[in-house]
Each structure stands twice: as C-alpha cells, then as structure tokens.
Amino acid sequence: DASFDLTMSIFGAMFAPRPFDVAREMVRVTRPGGRVVMGNWIPNDPSFISQLLRVSSAFSPPPPEGFISPMLWGVEDHIVERFGKAGVERASISTTRETFRFARADRTPADFIEAFRRFYGPTMNAFEAAEKNGRQDDLYRELVALAEEHNEAKDGGVSIPATFLKVTVCL
C-alpha cells in the first residue's frame, strides 16, 4: 500500500476485466503525492488502433454478457467515475490526447499486421474467429489495407500514428 511514486500502465490495464478494481488498485499502491499515469486507446477515433479494433471486432463473436469495453478507458467521463469511486477528486484527474507512433524502418505494413496477428490479444482473437469462419484472408487483407492507409513512412518502412488518451491522476 502507498508504495510507489508512480504507477503507470500504457495500453495494458485498460484491458483488465474489472475497471473499477483497476482504478482502486492503482490508487491503493501509489503513495500520497504520487501519480497514476495511463495511456488508453480512444473509442471511435479515426486513428489506427481504434480502426484496427473496429475491424477486428467485425470478425469476432459478440462479447459475453456483462462485458465492459476496454475502450471506455479512453473516455474522460468514465475515467473520472472510476477514479472517483477510488476516492480521487475530479480536480486531481487530467487527460490529454497524445500520439503514439509505431515506427520501424525495416518493416512493411504487412509485417506490422503479422506482428499484431501473433502478439496483440484483440487481433489474435479476431484471426482465431475468422479462421473458424473461413474469413482469415479477408481479415488479413482488410487490416493490411488499413495499415497501408495510415502509414506515413515516405521511404519504405512503417510509421503509423495512433491517438491515445493520456491520463494523469495526482494523489
């Protein structure tokens, strides 16, 4: 309890199944005067990750009853509610839109999607579901086209921006 000066989760804790517990635990382990910092993807954003998740969900089965979308961590009102229930006042919570850039000079957009296919839970699940329906190639083509559309690299490689919500909670 109250052990850390900084508790940070970048695109991680947002995927935990019980968001109010996540906020409470992050507050619990952070000392008074410390900070909780999160980076969370934003729902319905036109940037890459939000669109990748939209495409992936179209190939996935519906979520189970009671499922709370991790994308709600990208909505300020939900953040305020979650940390508020953990005892944090609204004035101690700030959010800003920031950009994360996926950049690799030695990779193509197709390589990039292949990495997401193997290592990123939402796309792994979408590919598993698409394979069962014989639509794996459709999903792959759609995601590669999306990566190519968002790729800003001028001389080959990958440079894909993705907007996220930076959350700072001062305790």
Which residue stretches match the model-derived regions?
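Core SAM-dependent methyltransferase catalytic element
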Residues: 86-89, 110-113, 122, 160-171
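A short, conserved alpha-helix within the catalytic core of class I
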Residues: 16-26
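C-terminal helical/coil "lid" or tail adjacent to the Rossmann-like core of SAM-dependent
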Residues: 90-154
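Short catalytic micro-motifs in class I SAM-dependent methyltransferases
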Residues: 11-14
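A short acidic, Gly/Pro-enriched loop at the edge of an enzyme's catalytic core
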Residues: 1-7
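Conserved catalytic/acceptor-binding region of the Class I
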Residues: 20, 31-107, 123, 132
